[in-house]
Design a protein with these regions (language model features):
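Conserved structural motif at the start of ABC-family nucleotide-binding domains
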Residues: 2-4, 17-19
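Conserved hydrophobic segment flanking the Walker A/P-loop of ABC-type ATPase nucleotide-binding domains
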Residues: 24-26
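The feature captures the beta-strand-to-loop junction immediately N-terminal to the Walker
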Residues: 30-35
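Helix-to-loop junction immediately C-terminal to a conserved catalytic motif
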Residues: 48
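Q-loop/switch helix immediately C-terminal to the Walker
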Residues: 71, 76-91
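Conserved ABC nucleotide-binding domain
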Residues: 97, 101-119
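A short, proline-enriched helix->beta-strand linker immediately N-terminal to the Walker B motif
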Residues: 133-137
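Catalytic Walker B motif of ABC-type/P-loop ATPase nucleotide-binding domains
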Residues: 139-143
Length: 143
């Protein structure tokens, strides 16, 4: 479970988040809807530790959360396969080419091509594949 209590975030004098309270429970799907600039991405960046904030965000100790941000960055000299292998190693997981190939039967990505050359949609798929391979319990997906 993830619990957000009295969350506040300011950029300079501009209040972006003001007293947010939320609970996310395992096994459920949640959607966060709001106008552009409403603070959705800021909330996700607070929840994942990218931004400092005031208030509290409590996560179960064993909870593994993965975050797919709105913008993706891929090194120009790394293939889709190399990116997925890197993401698995970063989480301390053994790299299984067979598991990657099996998952790619669903996503149908050209994993031998440089990820930086992928279309925007292909980059999103690659990022989501990485989250699935990392065995996360919760997926925070921004746009």
């Amino acid at each position: 479970m993830i619990e957000v209590n009295d969350l506040h975030k300011k950029f300079g004098k501009v209040k972006v988040l003001n007293g947010i309270h939320l609970e996310y429970h395992p096994g459920k799907i949640y959607g966060l809807v709001g106008e552009n600039g409403a603070g959705k991405t800021t909330l996700f960046n607070c929840m994942t530790g990218i931004y400092d904030y005031t208030g509290s965000i409590t996560k179960s100790k064993t909870l593994k959360a993965g975050y797919l941000s709105a913008s993706n960055f891929f090194y120009s000299q790394i293939t889709g396969l190399e990116y997925l292998e890197f993401c698995m190693k970063a989480k301390g997981l053994p790299v299984s080419t067979l598991t990657i190939q099996h998952l790619n039967e669903i996503f149908q990505l050209p994993l031998d091509r440089y990820a930086a050359e992928y279309s925007t949609g292909m980059k999103k798929k690659l990022g989501f594949m990485a989250l699935l391979l990392q065995e996360n319990d919760v997926f925070i997906l921004d746009e």
